[in-house]
Amino acid sequence: MANFDLTRINCQFLDRHLTFPLLEFLCGKEIYNQQELLEYILETVNKTNMIDYTMDTRKRLNLSQEMPDELVQRKAEVLATLKQLQNEVAPIMKATDILKNGESMKDSKTFVNALQKDYNFKVEHLESAYKLAKYLYECGNYQESTSYLYFCLIVMSPNDKNYLNVLWGKLAAEILTLNWNTALEDLTRLRDYIDSANFSTIQALQQRTWLIHWSVLVFFNHPKGRDLIIEMFLYKPLYLNAIQTMCPHIMRYLATAVVINRTRRNALKDLIKVIQQESYTYRDPITEFLECLYVNFDFEGARLKLHECQTVILNDFFIVACLNEFVEDARLMIFETFCRIHQCITISMLADKLNMKPNEAECWIVNLIRNARLNAKIDSKLGHVVMGTQPLSPYQQLVEKIDSLSMRSEHLAGLIERKSKQNNKESIDSWKYY
Amino acid sequence: MSRFFANGSDSESESSEEEVQAPNFNKASAFQFSDDEEEVKRVVRSTKEKRYENLTSIIKTIRNHKKIKDIPNTLSSFEDLTRAYTKALPVISKEENGITPRFYIRCLAELEDFINEIWEDREGRRNLSKNNTKSLGTLRQKVRKYIKDFEEDLSRFREAPDQESEAEDEEAHVSDAGEAADDSYAGFKKEASVTAPKIAKSAPAKSVPADDEDSDDSIDWDSDSESETESSEDENQYQNMRERFLKRSTEKGEDKGDDDKRKDKRKEQKLKIRKRAEDDEDGEWETVVKGHVVEKPKMFEKDAEIDIPLVLAKLVEIMSARGKKRTDRRLQIDLLFELRDISDQHNLGVPVSVKIHFNIISAIFDYNQKISEPMKMEHWALLLEVMQSMMKLLLANADISISESVAEEHEEYITAPFYIRGCPLAAVERLDDEFTKLLKECDPHSNDYVSRLKDEMNVVKTIELVLQYFEQCGNPNERCRIYLRKIEHLYYKFDPEVLKKKRGEVPATTATSVDVMDKLCKFIYAKDDTDRIRTRAILAHIYHHAMHDNWFQARDLVLMSHLQDNIDAADPATRILYNRMMANLGLCAFRQENVKDAHHCLVDLMVTGKPKELLAQGLLPQRQHERSAEQEKIEKQRQMPFHMHINLELLECVYLVSAMLLEIPYIAAHEFDARRRMISKTFYQQLRSSERQSLVGPPESMREHVVAAAKAMRCGNWQACANFIVNKKMNTKVWDLFYESDRVREMLVKFIKEESLRTYLFTYSNVYTSISIPSLAQMYELPVPKVHSIISKMIINEELMASLDDPSETVVMHRSEPSRLQALAMQFVDKVTNLVDVNEKVFDMKQGNFFQRGNMGNRGDRGYNRNQNNQGGNWGGQRRDNRNQRNRNQRGHHKNQQQQQQQQVQTIDEE
């Protein structure tokens, strides 16, 4: 399944620290050579300050149990730097702790003022706080890093050169500490900042591409994310354009999100348009599934693709949690489309198309009928499902049209009435002048 | 679609006015002309003398007018002259055996030269008064028309020794006069024996008056010879003098002696002039040329030490004559070549050589004074050669930098970093333009064109050299310009390697033209700061992609560049390129099975009915002076050379076929829909014109084939349809023009099958309750899943009221035909809906402006209308006016509505 694996591409757009979960996930999947993967992880880890993680990886690679001197030395160095940075920031943090309890915490401006007035706060302090946060992050201490970053965000003005970095750092740290709620907040803040800041076109595109990749992590883990991902990727032209030009592979996640979101069925049409447009740059079983089902009405193809989808999802870190939902919803989609087209279906064929056993399928359909989601009857003697839908009679059509007509006229009349009332008042007013 | 005619020649309007008027003048004069002819019937004795006298006097006035450049008067005198000549015509034919008298021809020749000179001199022409300009145009046309009758005489005159050569206007006037006089003298000697008796006979009658007048003029011959008109008078004098010599040479001995004296002086001047080797010179001239060869070394003093400053000084001296009216341009070129040889002989170094090369190039460009006309072939060859050798020199010597930014005084020829002023970029651009002009000049179907086209290689090579040079040392801007030149030679050429590479037949590392194009264009996208170069590069890039079937890349480029939005603001050449690009994109979409997109791309071009004009592949036949000659000239300059043309028949066929594939199923689906819109107007026109024919024969032309196919498709007969579209005739006419024609044909048949199936289902679904899918598949020779998919799509889109019955594999139709009453009711509802739509629209529209604060929206309900009328009385004057007016409108509106509704009810009743 390596040919549908997107980890390699996704990692290009993620922070070094964000890639570790992905890589670790892959280790458990046996798609790639375990040894090579671990070596790659080691190499990546070496670029950070996470000494313990490095050691752990070395152990897994069966390298010497002893810590090499070089590493020992580095560890000492790291600790020393950390100490130094902490010392620099300590007074200001103490002050913050004190102020936190007071009134001045409510508003960032008053807070800054209070800091400056009472504790001799300077810009250099902010600088060192930022450095410390960065250093902590690099050491893998995300929790503490967030608190410093939070401080920075409050104190910093949006014009500061580090402001964007702080935003990014905060988002990364929140993601890594699995704080999805705050991560979502930070995500929106970062997005607003990117949209409003004056980047050159190419920079903005780059920033958005990164944001898109990071946000996928958040969206699939936050309960509200499934609506938001559609909202952001599909209905914000700037982001849709970014996906189309820079990273069409994001279509996979967008498609998954649409499939598992039953309430947003109308997004499907737009999605399919985009998929068709980009079909030459990116295709994978998930987009192909939708294409088969809604463009070509090739149910056999859809069935096969659905089968492939399962393995793809199983091996994708981002969406692995949605596997069952996806399969269930995809089946429903196939069935719905089927029902719209057919008036009589044999259960055995249906079972075949849905990748189910006939008994299971019958049971499934019975459940659907029982839940009143389907107007149909089962002819068990012949093994058929007969749809109960009747086409619109001309009479009904007529009534429907007239219905809308009367609605519209009423609305119009209402408007007019309001206007005339207003006018009456006006004319009465004008009377007074005579 | 007047994409590029919109602002084509606004600036030319003034001159075009003048052109329009010209024919009227001609008509008038022609009328008078014939009138006079009738009068001439009476012949009187001694007419000849009278007539000739008349003629000479008019000629004299013309001369005087010319002298002060009084063009309107010249024009009227010229008209007098022609009239007088017509009068004299019978006499001439009788007395002179129909030979036109020389002085008359001479006058005509002079006049022509005079006009040409003024005409050429654009600067001067612009400064002329409006009246003068107008007359000049008229005069020029008249003279041109008139002298056609005398062409033979004129050419003989120009050849003959007493001529004042065509280049008269370029010559130093004094020497010119001398030459002419000399010529007439020499010519006299030669000719004397032949013509003597004849002239002798006629001379006495005429020479006396002419003599008197002319000798008066000739008194101040030497001092007053500044203007060339004067000098030509002198020539005339000598002609007369020759006649005098014939009769009484001894009497005029004094005159002759005078002549001889001057001759010595003139000889020197003459030698200089003779140097240019006229093609049409006779043997007598050649000896003079030889004389010049002897003189050549005169360029430098015999024992002068030839070094760089000297050569440069000479160069400056030669070039300073550039652009002057009487400079002999050919002489200049020759001199420059000579200078180059000299500098090469003396090893003066590469920089000097480059400089001279550069000057040769500009001299060659200068040779041709008319911008619209191409240069001569031999010059062209010379130019290419010089250009290439110069570029080679430049490339071989990296320490020379040549650019426009170097000021004259900072040029450096002696020590190492050399600086030369000049711009090879401009030169190569001009060279390229000249090449296009050359191509456009010759007939595209002749071998001439092919042989000319072979030079394309050389041009590309030259551009390549310049490009190399600028890649070494050139700022991004210049590189963009030269890249664009290369792109413009590249983009329309098909490279089969690209397709092979796509199929993996050649290794992926081979550099194809698409790769080259990519590289060049990307550089321009990144570096260019003038919008025009980028736009053109994008257009060419898309064109190239489309040509090689890179449909998606081409489409994305179009969409991302947002060209459609602002192409209307571009210059005509760019708009033409845009149209060409669109045409090609349409063809590409068609090849890539995107019929709808193909139609979209082509519809703008085809709907106007003049794709030929829009693609600049020929002018439409002119209707009633739609454009003036000036405008036509401009449009001609824009035309594409033939080898870059897009086949129009192919284009139209692709358009019509894609329109057919879209339109026919649509017609079938919406047969009874009141709101049906046509997709393609052009296609409808074709259909209608075929329906108008009382008898439709078997199709002959491409259009007839498509129409016949469309008719077959309407009854779902795919076989017939496919046969009409794909057959031997259509193959040779259209489809074989595609690179992979077989694939295209297969695709076409596939589409025809599918669309025919859809049409069939739309058209005949009401006669079936159910249709078996396998039998449909058999009928249309399509695989069952495909049929299934097509029908499913139709059901989902609610085009077909049916559903599938899986166990029996049939389509069950649900479409219950509405009863008559129901149908009418539906129609009625549709119309009422329209009414409500209109109401809403009116409401929305009025809401925005004046009526916002008033009670205005009462159109919906008649009751309010009445109320309002009552209120109306209470309102102030101005307001009341408004109100009443509005009420009237409203009432009118309501009346309309009522009428409409009544009508509708009536129609329903009738039905």
Swiss-Prot record, chain A:
Entry keyword annotation includes Nucleus: no
Main location: cytoplasm
Coiled coil: none
Keywords attached to this entry: Cytoplasm, Initiation factor, Protein biosynthesis
GO biological process, one term: formation of cytoplasmic translation initiation complex
PCI domain location: 219-392
Location(s), subcellular: Cytoplasm
CDD domains the UniProt entry points to: eIF3E (cd21378)
Subunit field text: Component of the eukaryotic translation initiation factor 3 (eIF-3) complex. The eIF-3 complex interacts with pix. Interacts with mxt.
HAMAP family assigned to the protein according to its UniProt record, in alphabetical order: eIF3e
Family: Belongs to the eIF-3 subunit E family.
Name of the protein this chain belongs to: Eukaryotic translation initiation factor 3 subunit E
Organism of origin: Drosophila persimilis
Gene designation per UniProt: eIF3-S6
From Swiss-Prot, chain B:
SUPFAM superfamilies per the UniProt record, alphabetical: Winged helix' DNA-binding domain (SSF46785)
Gene Ontology terms: cellular component: eukaryotic 43S preinitiation complex; eukaryotic 48S preinitiation complex; eukaryotic translation initiation factor 3 complex
PROSITE patterns reported for this sequence: PCI
GO BP: formation of cytoplasmic translation initiation complex
Record-annotated PCI domain positions: 642-818
Source taxon at top rank: Eukaryota
PANTHER family linked to this entry: EUKARYOTIC TRANSLATION INITATION FACTOR 3, SUBUNIT 8 EIF3S8 -RELATED, EUKARYOTIC TRANSLATION INITIATION FACTOR 3 SUBUNIT C-RELATED
Family recorded in the similarity comment: Belongs to the eIF-3 subunit C family.
Name this protein carries in UniProt: Eukaryotic translation initiation factor 3 subunit C
The organism of origin for this protein: Drosophila persimilis
Gene coding for it: eIF3c
